[in-house]
């Protein structure tokens, strides 16, 4: 019988964790239909069946780690059970069998069965994250009765809000809250022990690898944001009118400045592969996005060929996809340089950690008004931002790193030059 195997995902991804089975044993499966959701280091992907038939066996359970090429399910012949989405579209024979079964049971049993079937149907058709589905099952919550806060996608916090509502507003019985586990080393102190998500474990592993396998160093500079802020203020309304509502932000300026600096200092756009150094001739800039599952870095492709509006629109689109868990692998791999903005969280200064397979990362920070000496006789309050470049000293010398950051500073302080180049 045909097997479903973990597909090839990306060169850097060799395994994943089964987040949720979308089909149960005995369910009918169409060719190309998703049967499970797989959580990888970067994104969640749906694994589809290459054959039509019946899911006759699940070779791994939710939470199991599976490798690329590993068999995870068996598809048998036959029509199987109707899927949950089509549970109401019964054939005449199925309807007759259902009627016969109802006659053999009490009205109460039939009513309970019907309610359970409806709940199962509602659980399946509601748009929810995999973790929210598991959380709802564990706590006996009907997802159909949970109101999502954003983007029509039910998340764990929406379920918590539902459970915390007054008892009079509840329509289903809630399962008792889980007892907090106690860490044995401190038996008298309350702690919570929980498994890290696959993505969190992978991030921790990669961050440690970067620290251990690179000669990482950080250099700093400061940028006077006066001119770019004034330019943005003058142009933003007309910019939105000219570009279908796309907002002019600071990220496009820093992205364009980074491309110019990368062209001037190509070592910053390189990586080490064994005994070779690979200098990239393309400019795919990663933009760090904070999500409920941690920090994700999708890439804006070919930034040297895009104008300000195209870059801003792409950044906004990738941010939405990241927060709605809709990023694909193509969005997450093979970048050349990364920009992270700790300023949105209030960070004044930091040393960002290099993204995998890259030589450097640019860190933006909060804009803070402070007194600056304009000349020997003049001090003015100016909106200032500290910028940081963490880099692999094996590839990039200090001279190039300082020069790169100085180029960023000069371009941001003279933003008209960036607009002319674009």
Swiss-Prot record:
Coiled coil: none annotated. It catalyses: N(6)-[(R)-dihydrolipoyl]-L-lysyl-[protein] + succinyl-CoA = N(6)-[(R)-S(8)-succinyldihydrolipoyl]-L-lysyl-[protein] + CoA. Pathway: Amino-acid degradation; L-lysine degradation via saccharopine pathway; glutaryl-CoA from L-lysine: step 6/6. Transmembrane segments: none annotated. Its cofactor is (R)-lipoate. The keyword Transferase applies. The active site is at residues 393, 397. InterPro entries: 2-oxoA_DH_lipoyl-BS, 2-oxoacid_dehydrogenase, 2-oxoacid_DH_actylTfrase, Biotin_lipoyl, CAT-like_dom_sf, E3-bd_dom_sf, PSBD, Single_hybrid_motif. Keywords: Acyltransferase, Lipoyl, Transferase, Tricarboxylic acid cycle. SUPFAM superfamilies: CoA-dependent acyltransferases (SSF52777), Single hybrid motif (SSF51230). Residues 1-76 form the Lipoyl-binding domain. Residues 127-163 form the Peripheral subunit-binding (PSBD) domain. Residues 80-94, 114-130 have a biased composition (Polar residues). Disulfide bonds: none annotated. GO terms for cellular component: cytosol; oxoglutarate dehydrogenase complex. Residues 152-163 have a biased composition (Basic and acidic residues). GO terms for biological process: L-lysine catabolic process to acetyl-CoA via saccharopine; tricarboxylic acid cycle. This is Dihydrolipoyllysine-residue succinyltransferase component of 2-oxoglutarate dehydrogenase complex. It comes from Staphylococcus aureus (strain bovine RF122 / ET3-1).
């Amino acid at each position: 019988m045909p097997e479903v195997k973990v597909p090839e995902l990306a060169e850097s991804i060799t395994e994943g964790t089964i987040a949720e089975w979308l089909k149960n044993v005995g369910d009918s499966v169409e060719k190309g239909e998703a049967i499970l959701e797989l959580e990888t280091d970067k994104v969640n992907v749906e694994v589809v069946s290459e054959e039509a038939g019946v899911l006759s066996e699940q070779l791994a359970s939710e939470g199991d780690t599976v490798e690329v090429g590993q068999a995870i399910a068996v598809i048998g012949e036959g029509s199987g059970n109707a899927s949950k989405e089509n549970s109401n579209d019964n054939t005449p024979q199925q309807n007759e069998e259902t009627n016969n079964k109802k006659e053999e049971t009490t009205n109460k049993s039939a009513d309970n069965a019907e309610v359970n079937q409806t709940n199962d149907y509602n659980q399946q058709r509601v748009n929810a994250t995999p973790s929210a589905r598991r959380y709802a099952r564990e706590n006996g919550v009907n997802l159909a009765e949970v109101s999502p806060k954003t983007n029509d996608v039910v998340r764990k916090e929406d379920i918590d809000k539902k459970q915390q509502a007054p008892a009079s507003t509840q329509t289903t019985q809630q399962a008792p809250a889980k007892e907090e586990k106690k860490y044995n080393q401190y038996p008298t102190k309350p702690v919570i022990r929980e498994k890290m998500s696959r993505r969190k474990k992978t991030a921790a592993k990669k961050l440690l690898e970067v620290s251990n396998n690179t000669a990482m160093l950080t250099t700093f500079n400061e940028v006077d944001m006066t001119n770019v802020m004034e330019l943005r203020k003058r142009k933003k309304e007309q910019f939105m009118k000219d570009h279908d509502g796309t907002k002019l932000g600071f990220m496009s300026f820093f992205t364009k400045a980074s491309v110019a600096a990368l062209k001037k200092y190509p070592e910053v756009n390189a990586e080490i592969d064994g005994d070779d150094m690979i200098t990239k001739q393309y400019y795919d800039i990663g933009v760090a996005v904070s999500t409920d599952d941690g920090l994700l870095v999708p890439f804006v492709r070919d930034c040297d060929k895009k104008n300000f509006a195209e870059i801003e629109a792409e950044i906004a689109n990738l941010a939405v996809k990241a927060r709605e868990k809709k990023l694909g692998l193509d969005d997450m791999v093979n970048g050349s340089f990364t920009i992270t903005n700790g300023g949105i969280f209030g960070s004044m200064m930091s040393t960002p950690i290099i993204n995998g397979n890259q030589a450097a990362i640019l860190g933006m920070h909060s804009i803070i008004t402070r007194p600056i000496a304009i000349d020997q006789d003049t001090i003015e309050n100016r909106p200032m931002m500290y910028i940081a470049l963490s880099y692999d000293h094996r590839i990039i010398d200090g001279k190039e790193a300082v020069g790169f950051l100085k180029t960023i500073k000069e371009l941001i302080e003279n933003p008209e030059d960036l607009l002319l180049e674009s």
